[in-house]
């Protein structure tokens, strides 16, 4: 759908992405309500992006599907307060949100479809450590 000009049906999208149709239907409905996709009825039924893929970021999609990029105990970081020795933990959560924004607001649907990431994202991906999962010792 990212690079397609013709509407794509929900069934075709589900098959293409290996997702259950009902699950994808919920996602498409959320994306439609957020103004990321538009739906078409009738002979040309299906979905299209509401604006060019180069203008839709992963942050837009995540916010449409999940809400805020970062939450702490169900709260936005700026409203999560801590006491005593943990009082500066809020600063850490706000920094986490800023880091997520720095990446997710610079990756567009077009870049995901083509694999051509923004330089700041490509630099992060070039670090071999970025590809290593970390686990508790």
Model regions and ranges:
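Alpha-helical residues within the helix-turn-helix
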Residues: 15, 32-33
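N-terminal helix-turn-helix DNA-binding core of bacterial DNA-binding proteins
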Residues: 1-20, 48
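Beta-hairpin "wing" of winged helix-turn-helix
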Residues: 35-49
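C-terminal regulatory/oligomerization modules of transcriptional regulators
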Residues: 78-137
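Residue cluster at the C-terminal edge of the helix-turn-helix DNA-binding motif
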Residues: 33-36, 64
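Conserved segment of winged-helix/HTH DNA-binding domains
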Residues: 53-78, 91-98
């Amino acid at each position: 759908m990212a690079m397609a000009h013709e509407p794509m049906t929900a069934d075709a999208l589900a098959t293409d992405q290996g997702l259950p149709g009902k699950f994808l239907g919920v996602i498409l409905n959320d994306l439609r309500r957020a103004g990321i996709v538009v739906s078409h009825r009738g002979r040309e039924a299906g979905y299209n992006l509401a604006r060019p893929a180069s203008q839709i970021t992963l942050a837009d999609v995540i916010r449409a599907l999940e809400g805020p990029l970062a939450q702490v105990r169900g709260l936005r970081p700026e409203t999560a307060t801590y006491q005593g020795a943990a009082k500066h933990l809020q600063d850490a959560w706000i920094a986490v949100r800023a880091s997520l924004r720095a990446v997710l607001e610079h990756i567009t649907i077009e870049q995901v479809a083509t694999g051509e990431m923004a330089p700041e994202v490509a630099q992060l991906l070039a670090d071999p450590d970025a590809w290593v999962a970390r686990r508790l010792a």
